[in-house]
A protein has these predicted regions:
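Generic enzyme active-site microenvironment
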Residues: 309, 343, 382
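Conserved nucleotide-binding/hydrolysis micro-motifs of P-loop NTPases
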Residues: 51, 62-64, 108-112, 126-129, ...
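Short, Asp-centered acidic motifs that coordinate Mg2+ and/or phosphate
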Residues: 307, 339, 380
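A glycine-rich (often HGG/GG-containing) alpha/beta subdomain
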Residues: 2-4, 11-182, 186, 190, ...
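C-terminal-of-GTPase-core extension/linker across diverse P-loop GTPases
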Residues: 39-50, 178-301, 318, 336, ...
Length: 505
Protein backbone atom coordinates (compact mmCIF):
# COMPACT_ATOMS: atom_id res chain seq x y z
CA UNK A 1 0.00 0.00 0.00
CA UNK A 2 2.96 2.34 0.67
CA UNK A 3 4.12 1.90 -2.91
CA UNK A 4 0.64 2.61 -4.20
CA UNK A 5 0.43 5.87 -2.21
CA UNK A 6 3.79 6.91 -3.65
CA UNK A 7 2.40 6.34 -7.12
CA UNK A 8 -0.63 8.47 -6.28
CA UNK A 9 1.54 11.33 -5.06
CA UNK A 10 3.74 11.12 -8.15
CA UNK A 11 0.70 11.07 -10.40
CA UNK A 12 -0.78 14.11 -8.68
CA UNK A 13 2.33 16.12 -9.50
CA UNK A 14 2.69 14.82 -13.05
CA UNK A 15 -0.95 15.19 -14.02
CA UNK A 16 -2.09 18.28 -12.11
CA UNK A 17 -2.01 20.46 -15.22
CA UNK A 18 -3.79 17.89 -17.39
CA UNK A 19 -6.38 16.29 -15.15
CA UNK A 20 -7.54 19.27 -13.09
CA UNK A 21 -7.00 22.23 -15.37
CA UNK A 22 -10.55 22.62 -16.65
CA UNK A 23 -12.16 22.17 -13.23
CA UNK A 24 -9.98 24.63 -11.33
CA UNK A 25 -9.88 27.70 -13.58
CA UNK A 26 -10.79 30.77 -11.57
CA UNK A 27 -11.88 32.80 -14.58
CA UNK A 28 -12.76 32.09 -18.17
CA UNK A 29 -10.77 33.67 -20.99
CA UNK A 30 -13.65 36.05 -21.68
CA UNK A 31 -13.70 37.09 -18.02
CA UNK A 32 -9.97 37.82 -18.13
CA UNK A 33 -10.42 39.82 -21.33
CA UNK A 34 -13.14 41.92 -19.72
CA UNK A 35 -11.02 42.33 -16.60
CA UNK A 36 -8.17 43.71 -18.73
CA UNK A 37 -10.52 46.13 -20.48
CA UNK A 38 -12.03 47.43 -17.24
CA UNK A 39 -8.57 48.24 -15.88
CA UNK A 40 -8.00 50.75 -18.69
CA UNK A 41 -10.38 53.27 -17.14
CA UNK A 42 -10.51 54.86 -13.72
CA UNK A 43 -13.99 54.97 -12.22
CA UNK A 44 -15.52 57.13 -9.52
CA UNK A 45 -18.86 57.51 -7.77
CA UNK A 46 -20.56 58.77 -4.66
CA UNK A 47 -20.57 55.72 -2.36
CA UNK A 48 -22.63 57.22 0.45
CA UNK A 49 -26.25 58.30 0.22
CA UNK A 50 -27.34 60.91 -2.29
CA UNK A 51 -29.32 63.00 0.21
CA UNK A 52 -27.86 65.90 2.16
CA UNK A 53 -25.66 64.65 5.03
CA UNK A 54 -22.80 65.66 7.31
CA UNK A 55 -20.24 63.61 5.38
CA UNK A 56 -20.19 62.09 1.90
CA UNK A 57 -17.72 59.51 0.61
CA UNK A 58 -16.54 59.60 -2.99
CA UNK A 59 -14.70 56.49 -4.16
CA UNK A 60 -12.18 56.34 -7.01
CA UNK A 61 -10.59 53.16 -8.39
CA UNK A 62 -8.33 52.44 -11.33
CA UNK A 63 -4.80 52.89 -12.67
CA UNK A 64 -4.99 56.70 -12.69
CA UNK A 65 -6.39 57.11 -9.18
CA UNK A 66 -3.16 58.72 -8.03
CA UNK A 67 -3.96 61.69 -10.30
CA UNK A 68 -6.68 62.69 -7.82
CA UNK A 69 -4.00 63.07 -5.15
CA UNK A 70 -1.64 64.95 -7.41
CA UNK A 71 -4.06 67.30 -9.16
CA UNK A 72 -6.85 67.79 -6.62
CA UNK A 73 -4.94 67.78 -3.31
CA UNK A 74 -1.53 69.01 -4.57
CA UNK A 75 0.26 66.03 -3.01
CA UNK A 76 2.63 63.46 -4.45
CA UNK A 77 1.94 59.78 -3.88
CA UNK A 78 5.18 59.56 -1.90
CA UNK A 79 3.90 62.14 0.61
CA UNK A 80 0.80 60.25 1.66
CA UNK A 81 0.79 57.19 3.92
CA UNK A 82 -1.41 54.34 2.61
CA UNK A 83 -4.69 53.83 4.47
CA UNK A 84 -4.15 56.88 6.69
CA UNK A 85 -6.61 59.79 6.53
CA UNK A 86 -5.08 63.17 5.72
CA UNK A 87 -6.91 66.51 5.89
CA UNK A 88 -6.36 68.46 2.66
CA UNK A 89 -7.81 71.23 0.55
CA UNK A 90 -9.60 69.70 -2.44
CA UNK A 91 -9.34 71.86 -5.55
CA UNK A 92 -10.47 71.92 -9.16
CA UNK A 93 -7.75 70.21 -11.27
CA UNK A 94 -7.99 72.82 -14.03
CA UNK A 95 -8.22 76.22 -12.35
CA UNK A 96 -7.27 75.44 -8.75
CA UNK A 97 -10.54 76.74 -7.25
CA UNK A 98 -11.12 75.50 -3.71
CA UNK A 99 -13.97 72.98 -3.66
CA UNK A 100 -13.88 71.75 -0.05
CA UNK A 101 -11.69 70.72 2.86
CA UNK A 102 -11.83 66.96 3.35
CA UNK A 103 -10.06 63.76 4.24
CA UNK A 104 -8.05 61.90 1.61
CA UNK A 105 -7.24 58.19 1.89
CA UNK A 106 -4.89 56.33 -0.46
CA UNK A 107 -5.18 52.54 -1.01
CA UNK A 108 -2.41 51.27 -3.33
CA UNK A 109 -3.05 48.00 -5.17
CA UNK A 110 -3.49 45.20 -4.34
CA UNK A 111 -4.45 46.22 -0.81
CA UNK A 112 -7.81 47.77 -1.64
CA UNK A 113 -11.40 46.63 -2.01
CA UNK A 114 -11.12 46.42 -5.79
CA UNK A 115 -7.51 45.23 -5.88
CA UNK A 116 -6.64 48.38 -7.85
CA UNK A 117 -5.15 51.72 -6.83
CA UNK A 118 -7.97 53.47 -5.00
CA UNK A 119 -8.69 56.81 -3.37
CA UNK A 120 -11.47 57.90 -1.06
CA UNK A 121 -12.52 61.51 -0.51
CA UNK A 122 -14.48 62.16 2.68
CA UNK A 123 -16.07 65.56 2.15
CA UNK A 124 -18.92 67.65 3.49
CA UNK A 125 -22.24 66.18 2.43
CA UNK A 126 -23.86 69.22 0.88
CA UNK A 127 -25.35 68.59 -2.53
CA UNK A 128 -23.42 71.45 -4.15
CA UNK A 129 -20.12 70.30 -2.61
CA UNK A 130 -20.52 66.75 -3.87
CA UNK A 131 -21.63 67.92 -7.32
CA UNK A 132 -18.60 70.19 -7.68
CA UNK A 133 -16.18 67.37 -6.82
CA UNK A 134 -17.92 64.92 -9.16
CA UNK A 135 -17.70 67.51 -11.94
CA UNK A 136 -14.01 68.05 -11.19
CA UNK A 137 -13.28 64.31 -11.39
CA UNK A 138 -14.90 64.19 -14.82
CA UNK A 139 -12.25 66.63 -16.06
CA UNK A 140 -9.41 64.18 -15.39
CA UNK A 141 -8.30 62.16 -18.46
CA UNK A 142 -9.35 58.51 -18.41
CA UNK A 143 -11.89 59.02 -15.61
CA UNK A 144 -15.57 58.11 -15.88
CA UNK A 145 -18.56 57.63 -13.59
CA UNK A 146 -18.88 54.04 -12.40
CA UNK A 147 -21.72 51.79 -13.43
CA UNK A 148 -23.95 50.13 -10.82
CA UNK A 149 -21.94 47.52 -8.92
CA UNK A 150 -18.76 48.16 -10.90
CA UNK A 151 -16.51 48.50 -7.84
CA UNK A 152 -17.70 45.10 -6.61
CA UNK A 153 -17.30 43.65 -10.10
CA UNK A 154 -13.68 44.75 -10.16
CA UNK A 155 -13.16 43.24 -6.70
CA UNK A 156 -14.56 39.95 -8.00
CA UNK A 157 -12.47 39.98 -11.17
CA UNK A 158 -9.37 40.73 -9.10
CA UNK A 159 -10.06 37.66 -6.95
CA UNK A 160 -10.94 39.69 -3.86
CA UNK A 161 -14.42 38.17 -3.69
CA UNK A 162 -16.03 35.02 -5.03
CA UNK A 163 -19.61 34.82 -6.30
CA UNK A 164 -21.13 33.73 -2.97
CA UNK A 165 -19.35 36.58 -1.19
CA UNK A 166 -20.69 39.02 -3.78
CA UNK A 167 -24.20 37.67 -3.19
CA UNK A 168 -23.67 37.96 0.56
CA UNK A 169 -22.52 41.55 0.17
CA UNK A 170 -25.62 42.36 -1.90
CA UNK A 171 -27.82 40.74 0.76
CA UNK A 172 -26.02 42.71 3.48
CA UNK A 173 -26.79 45.98 1.71
CA UNK A 174 -30.46 44.98 1.38
CA UNK A 175 -30.83 43.48 4.88
CA UNK A 176 -33.74 45.00 6.81
CA UNK A 177 -33.80 42.74 9.89
CA UNK A 178 -31.21 41.48 12.34
CA UNK A 179 -31.40 37.85 11.25
CA UNK A 180 -31.01 38.87 7.60
CA UNK A 181 -27.92 40.87 8.54
CA UNK A 182 -26.41 37.92 10.41
CA UNK A 183 -26.97 35.52 7.54
CA UNK A 184 -25.61 37.99 4.99
CA UNK A 185 -22.47 38.82 6.98
CA UNK A 186 -21.60 35.12 7.30
CA UNK A 187 -21.93 34.64 3.56
CA UNK A 188 -20.14 37.90 2.72
CA UNK A 189 -17.17 36.87 4.86
CA UNK A 190 -16.80 33.55 3.06
CA UNK A 191 -18.36 30.91 5.32
CA UNK A 192 -20.60 29.49 2.59
CA UNK A 193 -17.72 29.53 0.10
CA UNK A 194 -15.55 27.70 2.63
CA UNK A 195 -18.10 24.89 2.81
CA UNK A 196 -18.33 24.54 -0.98
CA UNK A 197 -14.55 24.73 -1.42
CA UNK A 198 -14.18 21.91 1.12
CA UNK A 199 -16.61 19.76 -0.86
CA UNK A 200 -14.85 20.51 -4.12
CA UNK A 201 -11.46 19.64 -2.64
CA UNK A 202 -12.86 16.32 -1.40
CA UNK A 203 -14.17 15.49 -4.88
CA UNK A 204 -10.86 16.43 -6.52
CA UNK A 205 -8.99 14.21 -4.07
CA UNK A 206 -11.26 11.30 -4.96
CA UNK A 207 -10.71 12.05 -8.65
CA UNK A 208 -6.94 11.86 -8.15
CA UNK A 209 -7.17 8.52 -6.37
CA UNK A 210 -9.49 7.11 -9.00
CA UNK A 211 -7.21 8.25 -11.82
CA UNK A 212 -4.20 6.75 -10.05
CA UNK A 213 -6.00 3.45 -9.66
CA UNK A 214 -6.96 3.40 -13.35
CA UNK A 215 -3.33 3.99 -14.36
CA UNK A 216 -1.47 1.93 -11.76
CA UNK A 217 -3.88 -0.29 -9.85
CA UNK A 218 -3.00 -3.69 -11.31
CA UNK A 219 -3.16 -5.31 -7.88
CA UNK A 220 -6.75 -6.49 -7.40
CA UNK A 221 -6.54 -6.37 -3.60
CA UNK A 222 -5.32 -2.78 -3.70
CA UNK A 223 -7.96 -1.94 -6.30
CA UNK A 224 -10.79 -3.26 -4.16
CA UNK A 225 -9.51 -1.29 -1.18
CA UNK A 226 -9.22 1.94 -3.18
CA UNK A 227 -12.68 1.65 -4.71
CA UNK A 228 -14.24 0.85 -1.34
CA UNK A 229 -12.52 3.88 0.17
CA UNK A 230 -13.71 6.12 -2.66
CA UNK A 231 -17.23 4.75 -2.40
CA UNK A 232 -17.31 5.46 1.33
CA UNK A 233 -15.91 8.99 0.89
CA UNK A 234 -18.40 9.93 -1.82
CA UNK A 235 -21.29 8.35 0.08
CA UNK A 236 -20.41 10.47 3.13
CA UNK A 237 -20.14 13.58 0.98
CA UNK A 238 -23.45 12.78 -0.73
CA UNK A 239 -25.14 12.55 2.68
CA UNK A 240 -23.71 15.92 3.68
CA UNK A 241 -24.80 17.54 0.42
CA UNK A 242 -28.24 15.96 0.76
CA UNK A 243 -28.67 17.40 4.25
CA UNK A 244 -27.63 20.79 2.91
CA UNK A 245 -30.33 20.57 0.22
CA UNK A 246 -32.98 19.26 2.61
CA UNK A 247 -33.18 22.55 4.53
CA UNK A 248 -36.82 23.40 3.79
CA UNK A 249 -35.49 26.50 1.99
CA UNK A 250 -34.96 28.26 5.32
CA UNK A 251 -32.05 30.36 4.07
CA UNK A 252 -34.04 31.56 1.08
CA UNK A 253 -37.03 32.34 3.30
CA UNK A 254 -34.83 34.41 5.57
CA UNK A 255 -33.33 36.23 2.62
CA UNK A 256 -36.63 37.00 0.84
CA UNK A 257 -39.04 37.19 3.77
CA UNK A 258 -41.62 34.70 5.10
CA UNK A 259 -44.94 35.04 3.30
CA UNK A 260 -47.74 35.01 5.88
CA UNK A 261 -51.39 34.93 4.78
CA UNK A 262 -54.20 35.97 7.14
CA UNK A 263 -57.43 34.15 6.29
CA UNK A 264 -60.86 33.71 7.82
CA UNK A 265 -64.51 34.62 7.51
CA UNK A 266 -65.59 38.23 7.00
CA UNK A 267 -65.46 40.45 10.10
CA UNK A 268 -63.36 38.14 12.29
CA UNK A 269 -60.63 40.80 12.60
CA UNK A 270 -58.15 40.07 9.81
CA UNK A 271 -57.71 43.71 8.83
CA UNK A 272 -57.58 44.74 12.49
CA UNK A 273 -54.76 42.24 12.99
CA UNK A 274 -52.62 43.56 10.15
CA UNK A 275 -53.19 47.11 11.44
CA UNK A 276 -52.17 46.26 14.99
CA UNK A 277 -49.07 44.37 13.85
CA UNK A 278 -47.97 47.17 11.52
CA UNK A 279 -48.92 49.85 14.08
CA UNK A 280 -50.71 51.88 11.44
CA UNK A 281 -53.92 51.71 9.42
CA UNK A 282 -52.87 49.87 6.29
CA UNK A 283 -56.22 48.10 5.83
CA UNK A 284 -59.78 49.43 6.04
CA UNK A 285 -61.68 48.15 9.06
CA UNK A 286 -65.48 48.13 8.69
CA UNK A 287 -68.43 46.28 10.23
CA UNK A 288 -69.67 45.54 6.73
CA UNK A 289 -68.71 42.18 5.22
CA UNK A 290 -66.71 42.24 2.00
CA UNK A 291 -64.77 45.45 2.74
CA UNK A 292 -61.42 43.85 1.87
CA UNK A 293 -61.48 42.65 -1.73
CA UNK A 294 -57.84 42.66 -2.80
CA UNK A 295 -54.65 41.45 -1.15
CA UNK A 296 -53.09 44.03 1.18
CA UNK A 297 -49.37 43.31 1.67
CA UNK A 298 -46.93 44.86 4.10
CA UNK A 299 -43.35 43.95 5.03
CA UNK A 300 -42.67 43.71 8.77
CA UNK A 301 -39.87 42.85 11.17
CA UNK A 302 -41.16 40.40 13.77
CA UNK A 303 -38.50 39.53 16.34
CA UNK A 304 -35.75 40.08 13.78
CA UNK A 305 -37.41 37.88 11.15
CA UNK A 306 -38.64 39.44 7.88
CA UNK A 307 -42.23 38.68 6.93
CA UNK A 308 -44.55 39.74 4.12
CA UNK A 309 -47.97 39.89 5.77
CA UNK A 310 -50.99 39.48 3.47
CA UNK A 311 -54.49 40.55 4.50
CA UNK A 312 -57.09 38.74 2.39
CA UNK A 313 -60.78 38.96 1.60
CA UNK A 314 -63.16 37.31 4.04
CA UNK A 315 -64.04 33.84 2.76
CA UNK A 316 -67.76 33.41 2.07
CA UNK A 317 -70.17 32.67 -0.78
CA UNK A 318 -70.73 35.70 -3.00
CA UNK A 319 -72.40 36.51 -6.31
CA UNK A 320 -70.41 39.73 -6.75
CA UNK A 321 -67.83 39.08 -9.52
CA UNK A 322 -65.39 41.63 -8.05
CA UNK A 323 -65.57 40.06 -4.59
CA UNK A 324 -65.24 36.59 -6.11
CA UNK A 325 -61.97 37.65 -7.71
CA UNK A 326 -60.82 38.77 -4.26
CA UNK A 327 -61.83 35.38 -2.85
CA UNK A 328 -59.86 33.62 -5.56
CA UNK A 329 -56.80 35.70 -4.72
CA UNK A 330 -57.27 34.98 -1.03
CA UNK A 331 -57.24 31.23 -1.65
CA UNK A 332 -54.21 31.58 -3.91
CA UNK A 333 -52.38 33.58 -1.22
CA UNK A 334 -53.13 30.89 1.34
CA UNK A 335 -51.91 28.11 -0.96
CA UNK A 336 -48.57 29.83 -1.67
CA UNK A 337 -47.89 31.20 1.82
CA UNK A 338 -45.13 29.87 4.06
CA UNK A 339 -47.40 30.38 7.06
CA UNK A 340 -51.19 30.71 7.27
CA UNK A 341 -52.82 32.51 10.20
CA UNK A 342 -56.44 31.40 10.53
CA UNK A 343 -58.44 34.05 12.38
CA UNK A 344 -61.64 32.95 14.14
CA UNK A 345 -64.21 34.76 16.29
CA UNK A 346 -63.79 33.30 19.77
CA UNK A 347 -67.15 34.73 20.87
CA UNK A 348 -69.08 32.65 18.33
CA UNK A 349 -66.83 29.64 17.73
CA UNK A 350 -67.65 26.30 19.41
CA UNK A 351 -65.66 25.69 22.61
CA UNK A 352 -65.04 22.05 21.64
CA UNK A 353 -62.58 23.22 18.97
CA UNK A 354 -60.17 24.20 21.74
CA UNK A 355 -59.77 20.55 22.67
CA UNK A 356 -58.40 19.68 19.23
CA UNK A 357 -54.83 19.89 17.97
CA UNK A 358 -53.76 22.94 15.98
CA UNK A 359 -53.60 20.98 12.73
CA UNK A 360 -57.05 19.50 13.34
CA UNK A 361 -58.51 22.93 14.10
CA UNK A 362 -56.90 24.31 10.95
CA UNK A 363 -58.17 21.39 8.86
CA UNK A 364 -61.77 21.74 10.05
CA UNK A 365 -61.78 25.51 9.53
CA UNK A 366 -60.28 25.15 6.04
CA UNK A 367 -62.98 22.65 5.14
CA UNK A 368 -65.68 24.97 6.46
CA UNK A 369 -64.26 27.85 4.42
CA UNK A 370 -63.89 25.68 1.30
CA UNK A 371 -60.13 26.20 1.45
CA UNK A 372 -57.47 23.65 0.51
CA UNK A 373 -55.71 22.21 3.56
CA UNK A 374 -52.06 21.17 3.37
CA UNK A 375 -51.19 18.55 5.97
CA UNK A 376 -47.52 19.52 5.62
CA UNK A 377 -48.28 23.25 5.81
CA UNK A 378 -47.65 25.66 8.65
CA UNK A 379 -50.62 27.10 10.50
CA UNK A 380 -51.33 29.38 13.43
CA UNK A 381 -54.87 29.64 14.79
CA UNK A 382 -55.84 33.01 16.26
CA UNK A 383 -59.00 33.40 18.32
CA UNK A 384 -59.91 37.08 18.11
CA UNK A 385 -62.48 39.24 19.94
CA UNK A 386 -61.43 38.04 23.37
CA UNK A 387 -63.08 41.17 24.78
CA UNK A 388 -66.52 39.92 23.71
CA UNK A 389 -66.47 36.71 25.74
CA UNK A 390 -67.08 36.63 29.48
CA UNK A 391 -65.65 33.15 30.04
CA UNK A 392 -61.95 32.44 30.23
CA UNK A 393 -60.38 30.76 27.21
CA UNK A 394 -58.19 27.77 28.01
CA UNK A 395 -55.66 27.00 25.27
CA UNK A 396 -53.45 23.93 25.35
CA UNK A 397 -51.82 24.25 21.92
CA UNK A 398 -48.68 26.31 21.32
CA UNK A 399 -49.84 27.32 17.83
CA UNK A 400 -53.19 28.64 19.05
CA UNK A 401 -53.52 32.13 20.51
CA UNK A 402 -56.34 34.27 21.81
CA UNK A 403 -56.39 38.06 21.74
CA UNK A 404 -58.47 41.15 21.33
CA UNK A 405 -57.37 43.36 18.46
CA UNK A 406 -59.56 46.06 20.01
CA UNK A 407 -57.97 46.16 23.48
CA UNK A 408 -54.60 44.52 22.75
CA UNK A 409 -55.21 41.80 25.34
CA UNK A 410 -53.18 38.69 24.47
CA UNK A 411 -51.08 40.46 21.83
CA UNK A 412 -47.73 39.81 23.52
CA UNK A 413 -48.51 36.10 23.86
CA UNK A 414 -49.51 35.93 20.19
CA UNK A 415 -46.26 37.63 19.13
CA UNK A 416 -44.28 35.07 21.14
CA UNK A 417 -46.09 32.24 19.34
CA UNK A 418 -45.54 33.94 15.98
CA UNK A 419 -41.82 34.44 16.63
CA UNK A 420 -41.44 30.77 17.58
CA UNK A 421 -43.08 29.74 14.32
CA UNK A 422 -40.87 32.09 12.32
CA UNK A 423 -37.79 30.66 14.04
CA UNK A 424 -38.87 27.20 12.86
CA UNK A 425 -39.39 28.40 9.30
CA UNK A 426 -36.15 30.36 9.07
CA UNK A 427 -32.55 29.67 9.90
CA UNK A 428 -30.72 30.81 13.00
CA UNK A 429 -27.64 32.33 11.36
CA UNK A 430 -25.58 32.26 14.56
CA UNK A 431 -26.19 28.63 15.49
CA UNK A 432 -26.48 26.68 12.24
CA UNK A 433 -24.21 25.80 9.36
CA UNK A 434 -24.35 28.18 6.37
CA UNK A 435 -27.51 27.65 4.32
CA UNK A 436 -28.41 27.99 0.66
CA UNK A 437 -29.70 31.51 0.10
CA UNK A 438 -30.48 31.69 -3.63
CA UNK A 439 -32.02 29.59 -6.39
CA UNK A 440 -28.71 29.82 -8.29
CA UNK A 441 -26.84 28.12 -5.47
CA UNK A 442 -29.54 25.49 -5.04
CA UNK A 443 -29.50 24.60 -8.75
CA UNK A 444 -25.75 23.92 -8.78
CA UNK A 445 -25.87 21.91 -5.54
CA UNK A 446 -28.75 19.80 -6.88
CA UNK A 447 -26.90 19.02 -10.12
CA UNK A 448 -23.71 18.21 -8.20
CA UNK A 449 -25.70 15.88 -5.94
CA UNK A 450 -27.12 13.99 -8.94
CA UNK A 451 -23.62 13.46 -10.36
CA UNK A 452 -22.48 12.02 -7.01
CA UNK A 453 -25.45 9.64 -7.15
CA UNK A 454 -24.51 8.56 -10.67
CA UNK A 455 -20.91 7.95 -9.58
CA UNK A 456 -22.07 5.65 -6.79
CA UNK A 457 -24.42 3.79 -9.16
CA UNK A 458 -21.54 3.13 -11.58
CA UNK A 459 -19.25 1.88 -8.80
CA UNK A 460 -21.95 -0.37 -7.31
CA UNK A 461 -22.66 -1.86 -10.74
CA UNK A 462 -18.90 -2.30 -11.42
CA UNK A 463 -19.25 -0.07 -14.45
CA UNK A 464 -16.73 1.89 -16.50
CA UNK A 465 -14.40 3.78 -14.16
CA UNK A 466 -13.76 6.43 -16.79
CA UNK A 467 -17.47 7.25 -16.75
CA UNK A 468 -17.39 7.27 -12.96
CA UNK A 469 -14.52 9.75 -13.02
CA UNK A 470 -16.46 11.96 -15.42
CA UNK A 471 -19.34 12.12 -12.94
CA UNK A 472 -16.94 13.33 -10.25
CA UNK A 473 -15.50 15.93 -12.61
CA UNK A 474 -18.97 17.25 -13.43
CA UNK A 475 -19.91 17.35 -9.76
CA UNK A 476 -16.74 19.30 -8.92
CA UNK A 477 -17.48 21.72 -11.76
CA UNK A 478 -20.97 22.40 -10.42
CA UNK A 479 -19.66 23.05 -6.92
CA UNK A 480 -16.98 25.32 -8.37
CA UNK A 481 -19.61 27.23 -10.31
CA UNK A 482 -21.33 28.27 -7.07
CA UNK A 483 -18.33 30.37 -6.09
CA UNK A 484 -17.53 30.96 -9.79
CA UNK A 485 -14.11 29.47 -9.24
CA UNK A 486 -14.84 26.68 -11.67
CA UNK A 487 -14.78 27.20 -15.43
CA UNK A 488 -17.47 29.74 -16.24
CA UNK A 489 -19.39 29.13 -19.43
CA UNK A 490 -21.46 32.31 -19.34
CA UNK A 491 -21.34 35.71 -17.70
CA UNK A 492 -25.05 36.57 -17.75
CA UNK A 493 -25.43 35.47 -14.12
CA UNK A 494 -22.61 37.77 -13.03
CA UNK A 495 -23.93 40.73 -14.99
CA UNK A 496 -27.37 40.40 -13.40
CA UNK A 497 -25.81 40.06 -9.96
CA UNK A 498 -23.61 43.15 -10.24
CA UNK A 499 -26.44 45.26 -11.62
CA UNK A 500 -28.33 44.68 -8.37
CA UNK A 501 -25.81 46.88 -6.57
CA UNK A 502 -26.15 50.64 -6.32
CA UNK A 503 -23.85 53.14 -8.00
CA UNK A 504 -20.71 53.50 -5.88
CA UNK A 505 -20.67 49.85 -4.79
Amino acid sequence: MYLFNDKINMLNVMKSNRFFCNSSLFLSVSCLRRYTSTRRSTIFALSSGTSRSAISVIRISGPNSVEVIRKMTRLNKENIIPRKALLRKIVDPNNGDLLDNGLVLWFPHPHSFTGEDSVELHVHGGIAVVSSIISALQKLPGFRIAEAGEFTKRAYLAGKLDATEVEGLADLLRAETETQRRQAIRQATGELAELYNKWRTSILTCMAHLEAYVDFGEDQDIGHEVLSSLQYAIQSLKSEVGSHLNDNRRGERLRNGVRVAIIGEPNVGKSSLINILSRRNVAIVSPYAGTTRDIVEISLDIGGYPIVLCDTAGLRHSVDPVENEGLRRAREAASTADLVIIVMDVSTGPAKLLQLSTKEMARLECERLNLSFNAEGNYLVLLNKLDLTSSSVSINQSAVSALSCKTGQGLEEFLVDLEKKLAELCANPMQEAPLITSSRQRHHVQVAFRHLEKFLDIIEQQGDLALAGEQLRRSAKQIGSITARGKIDTEEMLDVLFRSFCIGK
